[in-house]
Amino acid sequence: MSKVAFLGAGSFGTSLGILLGNKGVTVSLWDRDENVINDINVNRKNDKYIKDLTIPTNVTAYKDLDEALNGAEYVVLAVPSHVIRTACKNLKGKINDDVIIINIAKGIEEGTNLRLSQVINQELPNNKVVVLSGPSHAEEVSKGIPTTLVASSECMECAEKVQDLFMDKNFRIYTNDDIIGVEIGGAVKNIIALAAGVCDGIGYGDNSKAALMTRGMAEIARIGIKMGGKAETFFGLTGMGDLIVTCTSMHSRNRRAGILIGQGKTAEEAIEEVGMVVEGIKACKAFYELKEKEGVTMPITDIAYKVLFEGAKAENAVSLLMERDKKKEEI
């Protein structure tokens, strides 16, 4: 049976660790937080991130990275997007070239505007990378609620190995070779979810959210295709599927942050109240720069940028969005 090491014992990493542990896989969870480590190893819980769950005994938490990695055939990067490069640097010289790297973070590297698999390839060029993405909240995965994701890689053999590793009666995995499209969909949908939350916070209704999600889907496809993704990817699980769940669920930290901003809080205040990383804020800045560079029209991203980084009032920004020049509906 395989051994899987997770870098990061947060909500999603822990949930996937539980899933694998229940399948009989040996799982190690590496984290810096000694309280989290003790809670997992002593109490078989991780109350800091997810309540009301029991962690199997074949899931062990470590503070020592070498111990966590010992014997692992797969390493799952379960850390926020802005620390992916640091995490990969920490893996150098500690894993063999045949270890498959599985990334579950969604975002883009701030400053370089690289996709996360590109960052991983820069730091660990000899290891194959698989992106595991799609509509999934840790709170539901940990409870065994039916969930479907995509394992995407340039190496289809690796994607199929990850598919076999995670497939379970309540956890279905499809494979996909469009890693560009999968990563762009997973990153941009966080911006749209923020905007959807803002609409909820202002008090707008279902009409507004339906329009925003639909036109947001167009923005995702537009920038994704420009960057080399396949059109069909954006209408699958990692595009439309992920967009739906992130824009509509209260499990979504991006939507929750957007609600707070719509109610008048600043981005900084919203992040503090949510208490976890809000990837859509960093993604908004990165894709604002990328769409300028690539010459892609992304009006929702434009408006989100004005609210997040230029101090525009949410209601005024929505008016700007609605009052643009008339045009034909198209992607």
Curated annotation (Swiss-Prot):
GO terms for cellular component: cytosol. NADPH binds at residues 11-12, 32, 106, 138, 253, 277, 279. HAMAP family: NAD_Glyc3P_dehydrog. The gene is gpsA. Pfam families: NAD_Gly3P_dh_C, NAD_Gly3P_dh_N. This is Glycerol-3-phosphate dehydrogenase [NAD(P)+]. It is found in: Cytoplasm. Pathway: Membrane lipid metabolism; glycerophospholipid metabolism. It comes from the Bacteria. Its main location: cytoplasm. Catalyzes the reduction of the glycolytic intermediate dihydroxyacetone phosphate (DHAP) to sn-glycerol 3-phosphate (G3P), the key precursor for phospholipid synthesis. It is an enzyme of class 1 (oxidoreductase). The active site is at 189 (proton acceptor). GO terms for biological process: carbohydrate metabolic process; glycerol-3-phosphate biosynthetic process; glycerol-3-phosphate catabolic process; glycerophospholipid metabolic process; phospholipid biosynthetic process. GO terms for molecular function: glycerol-3-phosphate dehydrogenase [NAD(P)+] activity; NAD binding. Keywords: Cytoplasm, Lipid biosynthesis, Lipid metabolism, NAD, NADP, Nucleotide-binding, Oxidoreductase, Phospholipid biosynthesis, Phospholipid metabolism. It comes from Clostridium perfringens (strain 13 / Type A). NCBIfam families: PRK00094.1-2, PRK00094.1-3, PRK00094.1-4. The lineage of its organism: Bacteria, Bacillati, Bacillota, Clostridia, Eubacteriales.
